[in-house]
Amino acid sequence: MEVEGLELDTAELGPLEGSHQKLEAEEEQEESEDAAGGSKKRVVPGIVYLGHIPPRFRPLHVRNLLSAYGEVGRVFFQAEDGFVKRKKKAAAASAAGGKKRSKYSKDYTEGWVEFRDKRVAKRVAVSLHNTPMGSRRRSPFRYDLWNLKYLHRFTWSHLSEHLAFERQVRRQRLRAEVAQAKRETDFYLRSVERGQRFLAADGDSTRPNGSWAFAQRPTEQEMRARKAARPGGRERARLANAQDQARSNRGLLAKIFGAPTPSESRGNSSPARNS
């Protein structure tokens, strides 16, 4: 494929700035080396970055405008964020007032243009930077300025990798936001369910005066009452009462006849053992 527009006059593209003299020196050095070696010069594509894209500016426009300076290859424009897009649509709908369908055009934030020759890309970026985009008086982009920058040693594969990385980061961020929203929803549902259980317990007849009741350990009397309620529990309760009465009668007889009580006899026998 023949490369168009390689031989460009510097007067047509405009004067070069002093900050890019180093790049020109490198190019001249490469050209002199190629001429000395007698080898054919290899055409290397170059990429120019567009930092500002006016509204309703499309890849076809940039291709038509920049094709006059050299052969343009691939062009990619980054669309605006979905949140900004929805905001603009809502603003357009409110401005229309519901009388007619609101007209909204998809806008872009930044773009990349590939030239077949990197030397042409460098010259275009230097000469057209901060110049009007439209040369005609009726052009809708007459009052917009070019914001061009040549990306040194940047290839189209680097751009593809960068865009794929941004898409992956966006997906991961979306998954994290969805997981966070799900956790918050589950916590809210559990809290609502717990509150419903508490409200349902307000009508419980086992809690007088609407006070909260908490389960405690049963007392000795309650335990005896439960045992007595079991089959055969009455007989065991009678035996326990008889044993208690016998113990009380034994202490009474000991007091009457002057004999020591069983507790005192145990207390007297303990020091004898210690001695």
Curated annotation (Swiss-Prot):
Residues 1-39, 200-275 are annotated as: Disordered. Residues 1-10, 25-34 have a biased composition (Acidic residues). GO terms for molecular function: DNA binding; RNA binding. GO terms for biological process: endonucleolytic cleavage in 5'-ETS of tricistronic rRNA transcript (SSU-rRNA, 5.8S rRNA, LSU-rRNA); endonucleolytic cleavage in ITS1 to separate SSU-rRNA from 5.8S rRNA and LSU-rRNA from tricistronic rRNA transcript (SSU-rRNA, 5.8S rRNA, LSU-rRNA); endonucleolytic cleavage to generate mature 5'-end of SSU-rRNA from (SSU-rRNA, 5.8S rRNA, LSU-rRNA); small-subunit processome assembly. Residues 46-145 form the RRM domain. GO terms for cellular component: nucleolus. Residues 164-194 form a coiled coil. CDD domains: RRM_ABT1_like. Signal peptide: none annotated. Residues 262-275 have a biased composition (Polar residues). The modification N-acetylmethionine is found at M1. Could be a novel TATA-binding protein (TBP) which can function as a basal transcription activator. Can act as a regulator of basal transcription for class II genes. Interacts with ESF1/ABTAP. Interacts with IGHMBP2. This is Activator of basal transcription 1. It comes from Bos taurus (Bovine). The lineage of its organism: Eukaryota, Metazoa, Chordata, Craniata, Vertebrata. The gene is ABT1.
